Every structure is written in C-alpha cells, then in structure tokens.
C-alpha cells in the first residue's frame, strides 16, 4: 500500500483534484478578508531516492532586497569640486576667443570684457562664444555695456540686471 501512496502523490486523479479545488476555495475565502504581509516564503525541498520519495521540512526563506551601488562614475565630478573659479578675459583680437572657449570646456565661468575691441570683432567673438556655450549646454548673459558672462551647465546665475543699462547705449549710437 505504501508503494501505491507514493505513486498517488505523483499522479493526480481528476476526482481528487476537483475535491481539492473545492476545499481550497473554502480555505481561501476567510484568507481574503485578512490582509497579512509576510516576509518569509516557504520553500519545500523534495528528496528523491531509488524506491521512494520523501519530503523534508519546509525551510523559511527571507526575501531580501539588495541595494547595489552604481558602477558608473561621473568624470566631471572631480572637476566640479576642484574648480569653482570665474575667469576674466579682455580679448584684444579674435584669436583670444579660443582661450575663453577652452575655459568654458573645462567647466569654468568666464567674464568677457569687450570694451577694448572694435564692434565688428566683438560681434564675432559673441557669436563664437554663443555657439560654444550652446554646445556645452551653458548660458551667456549680458552683464553690462560690452561685458558678458558665459557659464557652463554646472553654474547657475541667480537674478537679473535691469534694462536701464541699454538706455545709455542707445543714446550713444
């Protein structure tokens, strides 16, 4: 008879399966009324040998959430922490603009004074710096007459300068 019981566990009869479903439905109804959070999940281990099957005691397994640290490191973090400088430039020729662009690429804010250069070269410099600032995701702002502040993406400028600075410029032209 024990041999028959072993195979009974392997093969489910339809009559018994229907009976088990009816029984499990009755058991589930009261369980649906209660809300219980379990942190343990039972894990059954089945050991099979040549002539018989036996079940070991269910072990409790703890559900753990592992916190993994990201392996990606931002290369610009070191530069941001080291350099918090504002570079001042007063270009005399257009070729000085490349030095300003290099400082912007190194994530440093630059203040550009264009008072000692002719208007045509000043416009070319501002056009070049506008493209540089756009490429690095930064910003360019007019601070005063012929003075501009160029900032990379890691620098925020708070506040605005009033529009009164434009009035004297219009009168001079």
From Swiss-Prot:
For the keyword Cell division, the answer is yes
Give the matching InterPro entries. Answer: Cell_div_SepF, Cell_div_SepF/SepF-rel, SepF-like_sf
Under the cellular component aspect of Gene Ontology, which terms does the record hold? cytoplasm
Q: What UniProt keywords are attached to this protein's entry?
A: Cell cycle, Cell division, Cytoplasm, Septation
Work out whether the entry's keyword set contains Cell cycle: yes
Tell me which Pfam families the record gives.
Answer: SepF
Tell me the domain of life. Answer: Bacteria
A GO BP term here is: division septum assembly
Subcellular localization, per the record? Answer: Cytoplasm
| Family per similarity comment | Belongs to the SepF family.
Role, per record: Cell division protein that is part of the divisome complex and is recruited early to the Z-ring. Probably stimulates Z-ring formation, perhaps through the cross-linking of FtsZ protofilaments. Its function overlaps with FtsA.
Oligomer and partners: Homodimer. Interacts with FtsZ.
According to UniProt, the name of this protein is Cell division protein SepF
What species does this protein belong to?
Macrococcus caseolyticus (strain JCSC5402)
């Amino acid at each position: 008879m024990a041999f028959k019981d072993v195979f009974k566990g392997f093969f489910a009869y339809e009559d018994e399966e229907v009976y088990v479903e009816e029984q499990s439905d009755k058991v589930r109804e009261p369980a649906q009324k209660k809300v219980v959070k379990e942190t343990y999940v039972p894990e059954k281990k089945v050991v099979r040998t040549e002539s018989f099957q036996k079940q070991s005691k269910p072990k409790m397994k703890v559900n753990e959430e592992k916190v993994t640290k990201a392996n990606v490191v931002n290369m610009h973090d070191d530069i941001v922490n080291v350099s918090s400088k504002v570079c001042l430039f007063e270009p005399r020729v257009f070729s000085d603009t490349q030095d300003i662009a290099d400082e912007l690429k190194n994530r440093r804010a630059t203040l550009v004074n264009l008072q000692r250069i002719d208007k045509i070269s000043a416009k070319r410099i501002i056009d070049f710096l506008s493209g540089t600032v756009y490429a690095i995701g930064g910003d360019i702002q007019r601070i005063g007459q012929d003075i501009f502040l160029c900032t990379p993406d890691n620098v925020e400028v708070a506040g605005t300068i009033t529009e009164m600075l434009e009035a004297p410029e219009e009168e001079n032209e």
